[in-house]
Curated annotation (Swiss-Prot):
It is found in: Cytoplasm. The keyword DNA repair does not apply. NCBIfam families: efp, PRK00529.1. The lineage of its organism: Bacteria, Bacillati, Actinomycetota, Actinomycetes, Mycobacteriales. This is Elongation factor P. GO terms for molecular function: translation elongation factor activity. It comes from Rhodococcus jostii (strain RHA1). The keyword RNA-binding does not apply. GO terms for cellular component: cytoplasm. Involved in peptide bond synthesis. Stimulates efficient translation and peptide-bond synthesis on native or reconstituted 70S ribosomes in vitro. Probably functions indirectly by altering the affinity of the ribosome for aminoacyl-tRNA, thus increasing their reactivity as acceptors for peptidyl transferase. Its main location: cytoplasm. The gene is efp.
Length: 187
C-alpha cells in the first residue's frame, strides 16, 4: 500500500485487478476544498492511458514489480529473446510487451525487464542510445522548408528527424523514450 504522497513516475499501482504505471502526477491544493492528486496512468498490459484523480492521503495498492538486468539477443518472428546476465536463462517477450522501444534495440544491448509474478510487463531501454545513421539525404544549406531537419534511417531501421548537417555513417545519441535526436557522438 502506498499513500498519494508516495507517488512517483514509474510506480506501478494495482487498481481494480489491473496494473497501471504512473506516467505523470501533480499534487493540487485548491483554495477551497481538500487537496488531491491528479495522475496520468498507463495500463501496463494494454498501453491505454487514462487520467485519474485521487484524494490526498488515500492509500492505493501497489504491485510488486521486479526489475531484472537482461541482454537483448535477437528478434525471432514476433518475439524478442532476452538473456538474464546472472542465470543465463533466456526468455521470449512478445512485440506488444516490448513496445515502441524495439525500434531502438541493438543486439547485445543491456536493458531492464520488469516482471510481475514472473510475467514480463515491459522492457526499459537506457534513456539514451547510440546508433549509426544508415541512410540520410544530403542536407542542402538553403533548404529551410522542413525547419532545419531531415529524416534519417538508423541502423535498427528506425526513422528519426535530424539536423541538416548529419551525414550517413554518423553516430548519434537518441532519446529512446520519444526518438528525439540529442547530438552526435564524438568518435
Amino acid at each position: 500500500m502506498a499513500s498519494t504522497s508516495d507517488f512517483k513516475n514509474g510506480l506501478v499501482l494495482q487498481i481494480e485487478g489491473q496494473l497501471w504505471t504512473i506516467i505523470e502526477f501533480q499534487h493540487v491544493k485548491p483554495g477551497k476544498g481538500p487537496a488531491f492528486v491528479r495522475t496520468k496512468l498507463k495500463n501496463v498490459l494494454s498501453g491505454k492511458v487514462v487520467d485519474k484523480t485521487f484524494n490526498a492521503g488515500v492509500k492505493v495498492e501497489t504491485a510488486t514489480v521486479d526489475r531484472r538486468d537482461m541482454t537483448y539477443l535477437y528478434h525471432d518472428g514476433t518475439d524478442y529473446i532476452f538473456m538474464d546476465g546472472d542465470t543465463y536463462d533466456q526468455i521470449s517477450i512478445s512485440e506488444a510487451t516490448v513496445g515502441d522501444g524495439a525500434r531502438f534495440m541493438l543486439e547485445n544491448m543491456a536493458v531492464q525487464v520488469a516482471t510481475h509474478e514472473d510475467v514480463p510487463l515491459f522492457v526499459e531501454l537506457p534513456v539514451t542510445v547510440e546508433l549509426v545513421v544508415q541512410h540520410t539525404d544530403p542536407g542542402l544549406q538553403g533548404d529551410r522548408s522542413t525547419g532545419g531537419t531531415k529524416p534519417a534511417t538508423l541502423e535498427t531501421g528506425a526513422e528519426i528527424n535530424v539536423p541538416l548537417f548529419i551525414n550517413t555513417g554518423d553516430k548519434l545519441k537518441v532519446d529512446s523514450r520519444d526518438g528525439n535526436y540529442l547530438g552526435r557522438v564524438n568518435s
